[in-house]
């Protein structure tokens, strides 16, 4: 929607206040909304909009049979597991889905393949895992972090901040 597009452009402009975005490699989830976000952010900083890597490992946390349901519908159809997830989002696995812990394991080979700084355009679940894996936020705190649209999450040297 228009708000999301404006937020993507704003994220690009905020990134430019931190670094020269042309000096870093960019990678994004291949899912359509992150590809569009990366394209808009790159356009906002005068970079070729399609010149970035798409990596399947950055796909959002899989909610399995809960995919497409509202939280109210999940609570009604699977009250026991919904209550379990409300208590422990990091470890609870939705039916045929993945927990944040499993997402962390999925991201581990990607993380170990990186060298240097990157611009990563991904999803909220991925950001929460990176907060834990790179910035040392506890698993339970990371799973509860609000992810801000239109802002840049900077992860460096074991710390994080929003710009």
Say what each PLM segment does.
Residues 43-106, 144, 156, 163:
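Phosphate-handling substructures
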Residues 24, 113-125:
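Generic beta-sheet signal
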Residues 48, 112-118, 157-159:
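Short glycine/proline-enriched coil/turn segments at helix->beta-strand junctions
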Residues 28-31, 57, 122-125:
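Short, well-ordered beta-to-alpha junction loops that form the rim of enzyme active sites
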Residues 40, 129-133:
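Active-site signature of alpha/beta-hydrolase-fold catalytic machinery across serine-
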Residues 1-47, 77, 98-100, 104:
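Active-site-proximal alpha-helix that buttresses catalytic centers in soluble enzyme cores
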Residues 33-35, 60-61, 126-129:
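Short, active-site-adjacent cap segments at secondary-structure transitions
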Residues 134-162:
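Domain-level recognition of soluble alpha/beta enzyme cores
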